[in-house]
Amino acid sequence: MTESTTSSPHDAVFKTFMFTPETARDFLEIHLPEPLRKLCNLQTLRLEPTSFIEKSLRAYYSDVLWSVETSDGDGYIYCVIEHQSSAEKNMAFRLMRYATAAMQRHQDKGYDRVPLVVPLLFYHGETSPYPYSLNWLDEFDDPQLARQLYTEAFLLVDITIVPDDEIMQHRRIALLELIQKHIRDRDLIGMVDRITTLLVRGFTNDSQLQTLFNYLLQCGDTSRFTRFIEEIAERSPLQKERLMTIAERLRQEGHQIGWQEGMHEQAIKIALRMLEQGFEREIVLATTQLTDADIPNCH
């Protein structure tokens, strides 16, 4: 199917009617299930834009999106009315994607709660009755497993409540889990023995270790970083040279970054003085080698 948004005659007449509030109100009063209808104050119908729908979906939709206030005035419900003049097998999943996009748009407006979005498919194709399931979970190879996965709470790995002894048994992921669990601890020295044990097992490569140490420098207690590395190195002689090499590499990178940041700050100070003395903008740029975006910060 090509990504064309050109409406068919079927789509055009459908939208002409459904874009009219009075017509849409009658449609919803007649076709919404009673429990849902009772939740909606249909006198508050408001036509919503659909430009937020991702580009890959727009070609497939002849959609109408209405919002209504709830009967108690405490929230909103959205009704997606989709038109089809021929049956399409994966329509349920597309409607689900549309519904979640509408939910996201609602939250982007600043609302905390996720709104109900009611998808309705209006169908008048040659094949009758409509031949496909409109439960999107039926589109999976294993619908029963899909129901179990998507109608229950999602899986959670809350490492904050996993005992350290249990984490130590997690093979190649143990070091990451242990460090991230304790990264906010005031002093990581107490973790040295466990970390050393994990390093001796040989599950961590140099790239991972350097990234992990850099993470400790950025998010942990930097004042104790050197002692932390030295303690680990002393407890694992076979890893000592490797650990100290990585630590030194990080220090050099840190010095280089600090030097570059210092030079940049100095250039900004020079630019500020030049601008104050009336130098042309182009001369300031050429002299300091700052980018054009840096100059406004100098005013």
Curated annotation (Swiss-Prot):
Q: Which InterPro entries match?
A: Rpn/YhgA-like_nuclease, RpnA, Transposase_31
One Pfam family matching this protein: Transposase_31
Q: Superkingdom of this entry's organism?
A: Bacteria
One of the GO BP terms on file: DNA recombination
- One GO molecular-function entry: double-stranded DNA endonuclease activity
Which NCBIfam families does the entry link to? PRK09956.1, T_den_put_tspse
Membership in a protein family: Belongs to the Rpn/YhgA-like nuclease family.
Q: Which PANTHER family match?
A: INACTIVE RECOMBINATION-PROMOTING NUCLEASE-LIKE PROTEIN RPNE-RELATED, PTHR34611
What this chain does, per the entry, is described as: Upon expression has no effect on RecA-independent DNA recombination, cell viability or DNA damage.
This one is known as Inactive recombination-promoting nuclease-like protein RpnE
* Organism in which the protein naturally occurs: Escherichia coli (strain K12)
